[in-house]
Amino acid sequence: MNIGISQRVDLVRNERRDSLDQNWFRILKNFKLQILPIPNLLTNPIEWIENQKIEAFILSGGNDLSFFKKSNKKEVNECRDKLEILILRYCKKKKIPVIGICRGLQIINYFFNKKINLKKNIIHVNSKHNIYPNIQEKFRFFKEKK
């Protein structure tokens, strides 16, 4: 099964780079899924998605939503927001599963016109989050390939 995953944008040496934590591949290989990072600057994202035969999406974490931080261009990426909104429209129309992680869930919430409250003075980035060690046993989202 091909899973598309969005990428954060990092500013490194005056270059804007799409990036994805390598742990995504390490963790999801147990599900026998093909993980396809989605470039943020695709000319025709829908055509690319359909050519890749993507069957589900993960909207990953990282970066702030551009709706909240117009002044900080290092953290904000409007092209990522636009891409993820386009992905959500496509998923809704085609009934394709999508899950949001951290920022990804925030954009899903925004897409469905829900309220998002900006909290200040919360240390969250680069903090440790507990997860289930045997997550595959807890959830059976995908059919296992034999």
Language model region names:
Residues 1-103, 110, 124-138, 142-146:
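N-terminal beta1-alpha1 cap of cysteine-dependent amidohydrolase-like domains
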Residues 113-118:
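Post-Walker A helix-loop "phosphate-sensing" segment adjacent to the P-loop in P-loop NTPases
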Residues 121:
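Glycine-rich beta-alpha loop elements in corrinoid/cobalamin-binding modules
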